Design a protein with these regions (language model features):
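Short beta-strand segments enriched in small/hydrophobic residues
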Residues: 1-17, 132-135
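Extracellular/periplasmic bilobed ligand-binding domains
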Residues: 72-84, 130-133, 141-236
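Extracellular/periplasmic periplasmic-binding protein-like sensory domains
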Residues: 198-271, 281-285
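Hydrophobic alpha-helical segments within soluble ligand-binding/sensing domains
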Residues: 101-133, 144, 240-248, 269-276
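Beta-alpha junction/loop-to-helix N-cap segments that form part of ligand/metal-binding clefts
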Residues: 12-16, 31-92
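Structural motif
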Residues: 34-55, 110-112, 144, 166-179
Length: 331
């Protein structure tokens, strides 16, 4: 298990992923047939040396790292001493023979949502309205999300334009939108900001948002319900572990009782990384995990080194806000 140094920001953020890997390994190897050993990676450039050390120690599989720089370094190596399941995506399309990566980035979610939006509004493409409007703020993460949405929509064959909205502009949004024909609207902002904007958009306009904009992520159930009323009908994506918590609760009850919803997402990534690893350890050129906790997982080595992850399409409703057995908080 390739981990970041203890006490580092990335180590704390990735802790639920490690919890998921450990929980899945215990579930699968109750007989003690497998041992998990952690190797710290401080400098991305040392990734090769760390993998060699693990292989020399008798390791047969490496799960991690999470750091994008470290994953990039490994993906550019000509040879790997053992199979690797990286938990991030490299920028390039080429990678060593024994390299596999599971993509947990916001960009991968945006790409899937853009395809859904284009398909759901196909009838509008025949009209004057072919462009989507992307509503965002000056927040750096929102900006990153908006740029990803624009690129994904263009790639999917639609037009897109970004608009920055500040609190003092909200009152003028309805007037500004009057007379404009859009195929749909994307929210590149959190649920609170999205819920404030939605009433100012035409009610018939289809709206879309990633899980970041989903009000079910609110800790306060009343606030979640209020925001869900405003965002009623918004199409978004979630991981199966959020849509169907019963399996996760039953299988990993003791492991995830104190996890927030965001931590649950990362925990689920760890479980799926372990599942992929148990198949990748045999150098399987094709892998299918239809019941993955983070989505339907599929991999074809002939098509590249990245695992395709299909999330669950869901529609926001005030009748479906938060899971009562999960403590919700943003981290």
């Amino acid at each position: 298990l390739i981990v970041s140094p203890k006490g580092s920001v990335l180590s704390e953020a990735a802790a639920p992923i490690q919890q998921g890997i450990l929980a899945a390994s215990r579930e699968a190897t109750a007989s003690g047939a497998c041992e998990l050993v952690q190797y710290e990676l401080s400098n991305p450039q040392d990734a090769g040396a760390v993998l060699k050390k693990a292989a020399d120690d008798g390791a047969v599989l490496a799960i991690g790292p999470v750091s994008r720089d470290a994953v990039q370094t490994i993906s550019e190596m000509p040879y790997l001493p053992l199979p690797v399941v990286a938990i991030n995506r490299p920028s390039g399309e080429t990678a060593p023979e024994l390299f596999l990566s599971i993509d947990i980035s916001a960009e991968s979610e945006v790409e899937q949502l853009a395809k859904i939006a284009v398909e759901n509004t196909a009838q509008k493409a025949d009209l004057a309205a072919n462009n989507f409007v992307i509503l965002t703020t000056q927040d750096p993460y929102d900006e990153r999300l908006a740029r990803a949405m624009e690129a994904a929509l263009v790639k999917a064959g639609a037009g897109a334009e970004r608009r920055h909205i500040s609190s003092d502009q909200i009152a003028y949004l309805r007037q500004e939108m009057r007379g404009k024909a859009f195929r749909g609207a994307f929210f590149a902002m959190n649920a609170q900001n999205a819920s404030l904007l939605r009433p100012y958009l035409p009610p018939e306009l289809p709206v879309f948002g990633t899980s970041y904009s989903n009000p079910m992520h609110q800790k306060d159930s009343m606030l979640a319900k209020t925001q869900s009323n405003d965002l009623n009908g918004m199409i978004t994506l979630e991981i199966p572990a959020e849509e169907n918590t019963s399996t996760l609760v039953a299988q990993y009850k003791g492991e995830r009782e104190n996890l927030s919803l965001e931590e649950l997402q990362m925990f689920s990534v760890g479980v799926d990384a372990w599942t992929l690893g148990t198949k990748w350890i045999d150098w399987a050129r094709r892998i299918e995990v239809p019941d993955g906790l983070t989505g339907r997982l599929s991999f074809d080595k002939d098509s590249g080194s990245k695992v395709k992850r299909e999330l669950v399409k869901t529609v926001v409703s005030p009748n479906k806000t938060a899971h009562p057995d999960l403590p919700l908080k943003r981290i």
